[in-house]
Regions:
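C-terminal motif of bacterial Sec signal peptides marking the signal peptidase cleavage site
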Residues: 17-20
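Residue-level detector of alpha-helical hydrophobic segments embedded in or interacting with membranes
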Residues: 1-2, 33
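Extracellular glycan-binding segments that recognize GlcNAc-based cell-wall polysaccharides
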Residues: 23-398
Length: 398
């Protein structure tokens, strides 16, 4: 395309927000991050219109988009505004879930509130305060109020800071297990009936639990908690409220023992979905299907979300992306600068292909969650190539 064909004031990039805002979360330092915020509104002859200044390739490639927060607070704010652009009443959320960064388990459980009918994206408080990114996001989102939550604009979960000036309802519980039960109780009341399935995950090993957040956001199934060898009373009570549901235990025996699985079987039909490590576990969950439960992503034409196991709060922050748009499961990296071989193999398995015309094919898309300390641009570029549609006579990635 020739520049002469473009209006003189254009060459604009739309981008998702992102600076670090956390003070007391479990996220590692971000000193190694190198990406810059893109410049909006640059003219084509400006020096600022260079690809790096416009944000390419870090913020977007042909098949990937990055929410480049230095922490989960910024990522959640960016995701919420990507899912709800809030330019008019129809593009605003009705309510928002506000969770503190102090407990990743509560955040993962709160992802359930993104499911219908509440459709509440998640924002974070930090140490009893609202970070600037959260305040700004709330001010832009301006939730309209959810009648299923008593007209609340904000659902304050646990010890989250108060959002002054917004009609708020509180979800309370003594600990993460009790809060998960209370979150599920609110979702059940809003939906009018309990879901037929629940997810049970390890409260001790976040890498195995992270993929549950996106599924909860899509399905409305609760994420309930156990230790390796025990089931909290609140979890038992929450499962019982679903009247012998299908119980899907996410993670291997090293995370949730057979003894616990056997005990869960007394409360409903219990089944394990697992991989030997967090990377393999996430892939197993992405592939899994049992009736109406499970992603069943075993062929091309899907969205996928990528996050780093070192940032468990990002799973909750990103959950709305699994419940809107291209939908899709969470896959995991264990290091920013390396794409695990099992993830590469899985992406090759679901890579789109075409016979004669790529326009007649289906397409994959990937969301990168976090800055370059979470997902390096080199890894993003490799993922982009693995997502690209290919001629069927060539099995090679672009």
């Amino acid at each position: 395309m020739r520049f002469a064909l473009l209006p003189a004031a254009l060459c604009v990039l739309v981008v998702l927000l992102v600076a670090g805002c956390g003070g007391g979360s479990d996220e590692p330092d971000r000193d190694g991050a190198t990406e810059q915020a893109p410049v909006l509104g640059s003219q084509c002859d400006d020096e600022e219109a260079a690809p790096g200044e416009l944000g390419f390739p870090a913020f977007a490639t042909r098949n990937t988009t990055r929410v480049g927060g230095a922490d989960a607070i910024a990522d959640a704010a960016g995701v919420a505004q990507a899912v709800f652009p809030s330019r008019d009443r129809d593009t605003r959320p009705r309510t928002v879930a506000l969770v503190d960064t102090a407990d990743w388990r509560v955040a993962v459980s709160a992802a359930q509130l993104m499911a219908p009918p509440l459709r509440a994206p998640l924002l974070f408080s930090d140490g009893g305060e609202l970070p600037a990114a959260t305040e700004q996001a709330l001010g832009r989102l301006i939730p309209t109020g959810a009648k299923e939550a008593g007209g609340a604009q904000v659902i304050r979960v646990g010890e989250a800071a108060a959002a002054e000036g917004y009609k708020t309802t509180a979800v309370e519980g003594a600990d993460h297990a009790a809060l998960a039960q209370a979150i599920d109780r609110l979702q059940t009341a809003a939906a009018g009936k309990p879901s037929g399935a629940v997810v049970v995950a390890s409260s001790e090993q976040p890498g195995f639990a992270m993929p549950a957040a996106g599924w909860a956001a899509k399905s409305g199934n609760p994420v309930l908690w156990v230790t390796r060898d025990a089931i909290p009373a609140a979890t038992r009570a929450a499962i019982s409220a679903h009247k012998r549901p299908r119980i899907y235990v996410l993670g291997p025996e090293s995370a949730v023992s057979k003894k616990v699985l056997d005990q869960l079987s007394k409360l409903g039909e219990a089944r394990r979905v697992s991989g030997a490590d967090p990377v393999a576990n996430a892939i197993a969950f992405a592939r899994f299907s049992d009736g109406s439960f499970g992603w069943n992503v075993v062929d091309p034409g899907h969205g996928v979300v990528f996050a780093n196991t070192q940032r468990p709060l990002d799973a909750a922050a990103a959950a709305p992306l699994s419940a809107t748009g291209t939908y899709g499961p969470l896959l995991l990296l264990t290091a920013a600068n390396a794409l695990p071989a099992p993830v590469q193999d899985y992406l090759l398995d679901i890579q789109p292909g075409y016979d004669k015309d790529p326009v007649r094919g289906v397409y994959n898309h990937g969301w990168m969650i976090g800055d370059e300390s979470a997902v390096a641009v080199d890894v993003q570029a490799r993922i982009d190539a693995l997502l690209e549609i290919q001629p069927v006579e060539s099995g090679d990635a672009a």
